[in-house]
Amino acid sequence: MASAFSPATAAPAASPALFSASTSRPLSLTAAAAAVSARIPSRRGFRRGRFTVCNVAAPSATQQEAKAAGAKESQRPVYPFAAIVGQDEMKLCLLLNVIDPKIGGVMIMGDRGTGKSTTVRSLVDLLPDIRVVVGDPFNSDPDDPEVMGPEVRERVLEGEKLPVVTAKITMVDLPLGATEDRVCGTIDIEKALTDGVKAFEPGLLAKANRGILYVDEVNLLDDHLVDVLLDSAASGWNTVEREGISISHPARFILIGSGNPEEGELRPQLLDRFGMHAQVGTVRDAELRVKIVEERARFDRDPKAFRESYLEEQDKLQQQISSARSNLGAVQIDHDLRVKISKVCAELNVDGLRGDIVTNRAAKALAALKGRDTVTVEDIATVIPNCLRHRLRKDPLESIDSGLLVVEKFYEVFT
């Protein structure tokens, strides 16, 4: 049976009821895990049994071992994010998604050789640390049952004390040739039938949970895989169904896609699922081009020394992101501004409400990045073209609107 990835069938409610109805007090972690387990979908006719994860790496015994493993994986030097020259629109969209993952990811379209992949991969150094359960392939959060893997949730229900380690948010690359089983994970049908055990080998979606999933040349990816990725990103859950056996696990990640419009566009209904859209152009200023070439030459000669020269700027930016993530919940946006955002969307004939929601979230994230607790008109003006330009109705033969129409409508409504 083919994989079914549908928010209606694969995902539990987005906001868990983690409070006792009788006392209005927070539930214990064990009770919360039980509440989440009760909401995970099960279908009549699907087999039930124990859940095991196979073919995963052995857990690190200590935090030092985990750090050593992470250092080994990152031996290839990464170009510093702070050293990227220009491309401010793309960099801002990436930072806002790191601050608020619920924005829904970003689609980056631009000419070849403009630094799309380099910029996305340079984001790794700025990602904050998170607490994860040692040895868990789903990067389970030990404090939040909503993002726990099934095996960890069972351990919590049994009262086991979970070993925890601090690790960097991961970035997972999805290759163009990946199969659906590699992306979603596979079930060992033979073991399930003979031993009554749901033997599940996690895929890339499991590895990307609580992290970033990057798809280069996403416009060349098979449409059914794009559907799978977007549905999982929207629902936060991945469900694998094979031969009457169903397994669900959390898959909350920031989806970042990039591509060259000359090689083809994504379908409009798929574009709409990306929270933001960034356009990247070739730098035309001769001085900037020379600076980019020189900086790249410095990096190629001595990557370590080049990275150290930007260490202070990188640390400052990382602290700014961490502070913005912490203060995001305190940021407010006036009702009048929310009404005007919706008016812009309505007058541009934007289908659905995703444009309204994403614009509100992106404006709040930008205010938090700037260290403020109130959204201004300037914040909205900065993000609204990236939130709406790819949602406008257009002639199939035209390229994506450059954002000028959005900007014109914005100033018409806000002035």
UniProtKB/Swiss-Prot annotation:
<keyword id="KW-0149">Chlorophyll biosynthesis</keyword>
<keyword id="KW-0547">Nucleotide-binding</keyword>
<keyword id="KW-0067">ATP-binding</keyword>
<keyword id="KW-0436">Ligase</keyword>
<dbReference type="InterPro" id="IPR045006">
    <property type="entry name" value="CHLI-like"/>
</dbReference>
<dbReference type="GO" id="GO:0016851">
    <property type="term" value="F:magnesium chelatase activity"/>
</dbReference>
<comment type="subunit">
    <text>The magnesium chelatase complex is a heterotrimer consisting of subunits CHLI, CHLD and CHLH.</text>
</comment>
<dbReference type="InterPro" id="IPR011775">
    <property type="entry name" value="Mg_chelatase_ATPase-isu"/>
</dbReference>
<dbReference type="Pfam" id="PF01078">
    <property type="entry name" value="Mg_chelatase"/>
</dbReference>
<comment type="function">
    <text>Involved in chlorophyll biosynthesis. Catalyzes the insertion of magnesium ion into protoporphyrin IX to yield Mg-protoporphyrin IX. The reaction takes place in two steps, with an ATP-dependent activation followed by an ATP-dependent chelation step.</text>
</comment>
<feature type="disulfide bond" description="Inhibitory under oxidizing conditions">
    <location>
        <begin position="345"/>
        <end position="387"/>
    </location>
</feature>
<feature type="disulfide bond">
    <location>
        <begin position="93"/>
        <end position="184"/>
    </location>
</feature>
<feature type="transit peptide" description="Chloroplast">
    <location>
        <begin position="1"/>
        <end position="67"/>
    </location>
</feature>
<keyword id="KW-0934">Plastid</keyword>
<dbReference type="InterPro" id="IPR000523">
    <property type="entry name" value="Mg_chelatse_chII-like_cat_dom"/>
</dbReference>
<dbReference type="GO" id="GO:0016887">
    <property type="term" value="F:ATP hydrolysis activity"/>
</dbReference>
<dbReference type="InterPro" id="IPR041628">
    <property type="entry name" value="ChlI/MoxR_AAA_lid"/>
</dbReference>
<dbReference type="GO" id="GO:0015979">
    <property type="term" value="P:photosynthesis"/>
</dbReference>
<keyword id="KW-0150">Chloroplast</keyword>
<dbReference type="GO" id="GO:0015995">
    <property type="term" value="P:chlorophyll biosynthetic process"/>
</dbReference>
<keyword id="KW-0602">Photosynthesis</keyword>
<comment type="similarity">
    <text>Belongs to the Mg-chelatase subunits D/I family.</text>
</comment>
<keyword id="KW-0809">Transit peptide</keyword>
<dbReference type="Pfam" id="PF17863">
    <property type="entry name" value="AAA_lid_2"/>
</dbReference>
<comment type="pathway">
    <text>Porphyrin-containing compound metabolism; chlorophyll biosynthesis.</text>
</comment>
<dbReference type="GO" id="GO:0009570">
    <property type="term" value="C:chloroplast stroma"/>
</dbReference>
<dbReference type="InterPro" id="IPR027417">
    <property type="entry name" value="P-loop_NTPase"/>
</dbReference>
<dbReference type="InterPro" id="IPR003593">
    <property type="entry name" value="AAA+_ATPase"/>
</dbReference>
<keyword id="KW-1015">Disulfide bond</keyword>
<protein>
    <recommendedName>
        <fullName>Magnesium-chelatase subunit ChlI, chloroplastic</fullName>
        <ecNumber>6.6.1.1</ecNumber>
    </recommendedName>
</protein>
<dbReference type="GO" id="GO:0005524">
    <property type="term" value="F:ATP binding"/>
</dbReference>
